[in-house]
Amino acid sequence: MTKEVLIHQIIDVLARAGFALSDRCNIRPRSFDVAARKDETLLLCKVLFNIDGLNEETAREMKYLAEYLGGSAIVVGAKTRDQMLEDSVVYMRYDILALNVQTLYDYFIENVPPLVSAAPGGLYVSIEGDILKKARMGQSMSLGTLASMVGVSRRTISKYEEEGMDASIDVVLQLEDIFGVELAKPINILKSCGSRKPRKKAESRTETQEKPYTLLPEDLILNTISMLGYDVLPTTQAPFKAISRDKSSVILTGVSEFNTTVVKRAHLMSSISCVTETQSVFIINGHSKIKSVENTVMIEKKELDKISDSQELLNFIEERRETHDEK
């Protein structure tokens, strides 16, 4: 299987599951390959044949983009190191959940969540602690008795019941056989990935740019947007330069001089914005030959400089889009 085949399989699964899909991101490097939405579920999907190809910088950007856009970041791949990814098993890379196409299919089309997670040392299952404790006490069985039956310590059984420790597959099967109940806790692949502090992320990047001689024109433009009242998250591996967010809106924000590459990126940003349900704006440092590209509004820097707050910017975007739609 090639990566191209893998991407087509993933797109097919998501489409069959009822997701609306963005165009594929064709930039390098890229933090995600496709955005997908179904109702309130938004996915930013990174495709890697070998999931070990995910690096920390890309994973970090995936997490922050997902947080800003109210979605989940996942990696879909085929192998890790020298072995193929197992079905119904999830893997973690830099706090990003990774899985294979079959697991993706089972989750979104068959409504069958994975139960097993891979970790150093083997495969593990999270236990429904309350169910285990209720079953044990229902049979008036002590911690010690149960521990001896499955070959673990009393403390380990206690940890299982407190949901403070995962168990091996063999142990879970033994426990389920003893009590005749299902104990494996389903894994929600849409869960939030770790703690995210997007504001600090944006600030830390800004701090590295505070030296006057290192500021680039696009950085100054992002500062202007920030002064309008937006929380600005700069990006390094996305089709847009930043995500700008306030209490009422989220804007995919491109910054560049006008050229043919800008038009291509504006098309891609438009597609992504339709899926993420955000605004899409390209700030042109200089003259722009066009006013908009599909849903992406082009704004010259001199026009941006005349805008005083976030609401005025939104009004400007809406007016320009309406003008484009009337043509």
Swiss-Prot record:
SUPFAM superfamilies, A to Z: lambda repressor-like DNA-binding domains
One Pfam family matching this protein: HTH_3
DNA-binding region: 143-162
Domain of life: Archaea
GO molecular function terms attached to this record: DNA binding; DNA-binding transcription factor activity
Keywords: DNA-binding, Transcription, Transcription regulation
Domain HTH cro/C1-type: start-end pairs: 132-190
Entries under NCBIfam families matching the protein: PRK04140.1
UniProt protein name: Putative HTH-type transcriptional regulatory protein Mbar_A2318
